[in-house]
Regions:
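Extracellular beta-sheet/turn segments enriched in Thr/Pro/Gly and aliphatic residues
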Residues: 1-6, 38, 45, 69-70, ...
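Boundary/junction segments of secreted and surface-exposed precursor proteins
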Residues: 1-47, 165, 241-242
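Short coil-to-beta strand junction motifs in C2/discoidin
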Residues: 20-26, 35, 45-80, 120-122
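Short Pro-Gly-centered beta-turn/loop motif in secreted/extracellular proteins
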Residues: 74, 108-123, 131-132
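Beta-strand signatures of extracellular beta-sandwich domains
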Residues: 79-85, 125-127
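Short, acidic Ser/Thr/Gly-rich low-complexity loop/linker segments typical of extracellular
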Residues: 88-108
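Short acidic/polar inter-strand loop motif in beta-rich domains
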Residues: 130-142
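Alpha-helical segments with a strong preference for the paired helices of cellulosomal dockerin domains
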Residues: 166, 175, 187-213, 217-242
Length: 242
């Protein structure tokens, strides 16, 4: 499974890689910040709160008991939430896991949380969510081959209806839209990039050295560069059912 986030993309997407600044600075959940100004983020995957309420314990595998970097791979960009659905409806979800997103777009499942008890003969829509990017879903159902389900979100646009948006095309690669930091204030907040996200940015603008929802670039700081990303995507929405 492969997916890219717009915010941390480097070289305008030409290399298909993202930054690892949150890892480098020690701001990922469970890490020890690398400077005295850094604010530590408690261990645990970040999707145990609204609107996801995912209670998985994948994040417990990464703590300072394993050292200041908490045992994360050195090329970790952030966490994502991955789900499988038998139809486009969220009610058809049969599996959900928190996973690491590596800087080349690879989604790496946490050891011991690799798979769910699912029908290997079934096909599934693959859904990827991120805490401040727009939800995305595979454009077709995907079959399981050799006990593995594979899909490259960067190679083709994702699911969309006549009105909704899939992903953004940057330098030949599709990426998830940045700017969706406020996902709980209204019924459609998790699938829209709008003024609510800008309002959240204002409340945290100037914050630095930690793990923030309005840090769309994923570099540990909330500043005007993050607002500029929101401006680019204001009005974009997904019709992936939530």
């Amino acid at each position: 499974l492969k997916v890219l986030l717009e915010g941390p993309i480097v070289d305008n997407g030409s290399t298909g890689t993202m930054t690892t600044k949150l890892f480098n600075l020690g701001y990922l959940p469970g890490q020890q910040p690398s400077t005295f100004l850094g604010i530590a983020t408690p261990a645990g995957q970040p999707y145990d709160t609204a609107p996801w309420f995912y209670a998985g314990s994948e994040g417990d595998a990464y703590t300072t008991a394993l050292g200041p970097k908490a045992g994360y791979p050195t090329n970790t960009t952030d966490w994502v939430l991955v789900s499988l659905r038998t139809s486009t409806s969220v009610s058809s979800t049969v599996c959900t896991k928190a996973a690491l997103l590596l800087n080349d777009g690879t989604v790496q499942m946490v050891s011991g949380f690799d798979c769910c008890d699912i029908d290997l003969n079934q096909t599934y829509f693959i859904v990827v969510e991120h805490r401040n990017h727009l939800i995305t879903m595979s454009h077709v159902k995907v079959a399981i081959t050799n006990n593995t389900i594979s899909y490259d979100f960067t190679a083709q646009n994702s699911y969309r209806s006549l009105l909704g948006y899939g992903q953004k095309l940057i330098n030949g690669k599709y990426v998830m839209y940045a700017g969706n930091g406020q996902q709980v204030i209204s019924s459609s907040a998790d699938t829209d990039i709008n003024s609510n996200d800008s309002d959240l940015w204002r409340t945290q603008n100037g914050s630095n050295s930690s793990y923030y929802l309005n840090d769309f670039e994923l570099n540990g700081d909330a500043n005007v560069q993050d607002k500029n990303l929101w401006l680019l995507n204001n009005g974009v929405f997904s019709d992936v059912p939530r």
